[in-house]
C-alpha cells in the first residue's frame, strides 16, 4: 500500500480545477531517486524544460522549507519545499512570477520495492494562468510528468550502472 499526499487544505484536489497523478516502477534505489530529486544541479538532466534551479536560502540541496526559483512548464517559478521526509516524500508549492495568484502544489512519494522503488507524483494547480495553459493543451501537464518520470528513471538507472 502506498502513502497518500499530505495536501495543504487550500491545494487539495477537491479545491483545484487541475489535478493529475503519474506513477512508475523504477529499477533504481530509493536513495538514488532521492539524491536526484533533492539535488538542484541534477534537475536539468531529467526535469523537462528546467534549465536552472537557484536555491535562495544558502543550501546546496533541497530540504525542509527551502525556497527556490526555477523554470517549470515554461514559466519562471518561485517555490518552497512544504513537505520533506527524507527518502520518502517531498513536495513543493509555488507560483509563476508573472501570475502570483495561480498556485501549484507538486508532491512526490517514493516507496521501496523488491526491484527498486515506486514513484508517485501528484500535482494540483489553481488560478487563471494555469487554466489558460491547460485550455491550450489539455494533456500537457500530465504528459510532461510522464516524461519527467521516465527521464528521472533513466538517469537513476544510469547513475547506478556507472557505480557498479
Regions found by a protein language model. Give the residues of each.
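Beta-strand/loop substructures that line and gate deep hydrophobic ligand-binding cavities in soluble
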Residues: 96-147, 154, 163-164
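Hydrophobic pocket/interface hotspot
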Residues: 32-37, 43, 68, 81, ...
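Hydrophobic ligand-binding cavity/cleft-lining segments
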Residues: 1-58
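Glycine-rich portal/gate segments that line the openings of hydrophobic small-molecule binding cavities
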Residues: 25, 54-99, 154-159, 163-164
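Short, surface-exposed coil-to-beta transition loops
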Residues: 19-21, 75-79, 101-107
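Short coil/turn motifs at beta-sheet boundaries
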Residues: 15-17, 61-63, 72, 101-103, ...
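Generic detection of well-ordered alpha-helical segments
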Residues: 31, 75-78, 142, 146, ...
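A short, structured loop/turn motif at beta-sheet edges
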Residues: 27-31, 82-87, 109-118
